[in-house]
Amino acid sequence: MSYLKFDKALMINLEQSLPKEMLRTNKSGAYHCTSIVGCNTRKQHGLLVIPIPEMDDQAHVLLSSLDESVIQHGASFNLGLHQYGYNVFSPNGHKYIREFNCETVPTLTFRVGGVILTKKKVFISHENRILIKYTLQEAHSPTTLRFRPFLAFRNANSLVVENGAINRDIQHVPNGIATCLYDGYPSLYMQFNNEAKWVDDPHWYKGIEYYKDKVRGIPYKEDLWVPGYFELPIKKGETIIFSASTFETDPALFEQTYTEELKTRTSRTSFYNCLKNAAMQFYLKNEYGTYIMAGYPWYNVRGRDELIGLPGCTLAINHDQEYHVILDTFIKALRHNIKTGEKDRVIHEIDLPDIPLWLIWAIQQYRRYVNIDDCRKRYADTVRWLVETIRKGGIKNLRLDPNGLLHSEGRETPVTWLSASIGGRPIIPRTGYILEFNALWYNAVRFLAYLLGESKKDAEYVAELNALAETIGDSFIKTFLNGYGYLYDYVDGAYTDLEVRPNMAIAVGLEYSPLDRRQRKRVLDFCTRELLTPKGLRSLSPKSQAYRPVYVGNPTEREYAVHQGPARPWLFGFYSDAYFKVFGLSGLSFIERMLIGYEDEMSEGCIGSLSELYDGNPPYTGRGAVSTAKNVGQILCTIKTVNQMTKLLDAQESANSTI
């Protein structure tokens, strides 16, 4: 039985199939994303969506879709699908779908009378290019395929309407055409491996709707330009390959390119393989370095997200080299930012006060998953520089107080991951002593002391670090641990924030925590009772009057709700670490059971990946960006930890059996 396979009954039921999406990317930030039935449901959906650095740092939809029609005996059967109003779809091509399988490459099987046609899509790894392979498996009469391209040429976060500014010119190229609708955009080359007949038939297709945008309370209607169509005859057993790219290609090489790309694919035949594929889709390489995208389809590179997702998206899938290259790029960018105050060209939010703390944590994961000696050799100097820069006040909006704690000002501008704001002002004004900042700070100082512990020349400095850690730890307990047994989320002077939030799971789950085992267990119990869901930890306890579990409504309503209840899978990574620290090997079966909730998502939302957030209440519907790096990365980390713990348990049981 296939791991990711959907049958006719599901595919023709649009209530079930339309919410399911698929994503494929390359290493330049380009992507292909749509619903599994091929009907675009977001403005960010498209067959070929690419970054255009000369214009901005966002993606742009060139080719929105390609509608295929099967022609026999003069009758045309259109396989496309677009929405034009509430429950109004045309041309209803989904009714011909018999199966969708995306274990290796997304594959649709259509049946039109006696015709069986398969459609396989491959997004090229290192080029802004997609190949679609059509194979006529069965036919009893002469058959022709017609292809009608729907063009957008717009920012992926905007919409286009009929206008007279478009360039209607068509340039004929080998087995296809090239066109460019607006100045500043690259030409779109659409070619086939066989000779194709092009027919000029220019039309605006007006009033196409994207229902997921409508639900989000944002503009959702647009007009798309269709300049004409291609026609090619096809015989039983024959294959036609379509290529869409920003450069002219040799049609004779299409089959070879397709086959070579297929060899590089890891089949999505398991939970782990799905997440491994999802992780690699976040890799981004450009002239400035190598990065991890925060998520698709609308996020770019964001500092905190990159660091939280990095260990899982590289080390947990044995991509150590990518870890080093990405980390080296980040360290270089952060050094430049701290030295000059200039924002980075690629990494957004690199100047937030907790970035150095998360960077140290990301380095620490290399020691955890790979090797302490190599970690020491590669990164000890960087960790030392970061700790000393913090101690000397070199990080903007991060002040070290005499009590050893770090202070940040967040009343006017959000400084933490709970960053929702209205009118530029934070909804949750976390300011003063912020819980995870200081937990990460204690962890960082202890980690540096550990890295330098074997160095005789650093013995005095290590003693100084350990003394500082003692001061931080004592102040942390006095400041954050309350009489109820959990941790204040932030403390600002005499004000203590009593809301039960998941940042305390971070404090418990870190390798070095100022909390003793009894304190950790009490805090963990609060997380389990009030925050834990099958899709991660809630951002706020349901007992709070501010609790808003469902992330729906217009942009303002969603902004108010985003950090007031919806659950995040990435926080489960810290929760599982905390659980193992409290319960050891006896906690293994519980964490394994909890992972089932994430595996269930492999056939929901964005197939094979994890959404940005999930409703805090059942049925825990996925919301936000369809695929996010820190969620995928942290669940991969948990899987790796579970595998390590399983080996320890097996070894322990084996040793006991020989006694």
Regions found by a protein language model. Give the residues of each.
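Terminal accessory carbohydrate-recognition/targeting modules of carbohydrate-active enzymes
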Residues: 1-267, 297, 319, 331, ...
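Non-catalytic C-terminal accessory modules of carbohydrate-active enzymes
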Residues: 79-105, 112-114, 392, 525-533, ...
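Aromatic-rich carbohydrate-recognition surfaces in CAZymes
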Residues: 138-139, 160-163, 234-236, 300, ...
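Catalytic cores of carbohydrate-active enzymes
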Residues: 273, 391, 398-401, 442-551, ...
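Glycine-rich, acidic and aromatic/proline-enriched surface loops and short helix-turn segments
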Residues: 277-285, 328-336, 600-607
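Carbohydrate-binding/catalytic loop surfaces
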Residues: 282-299, 340-362, 366, 400-430, ...
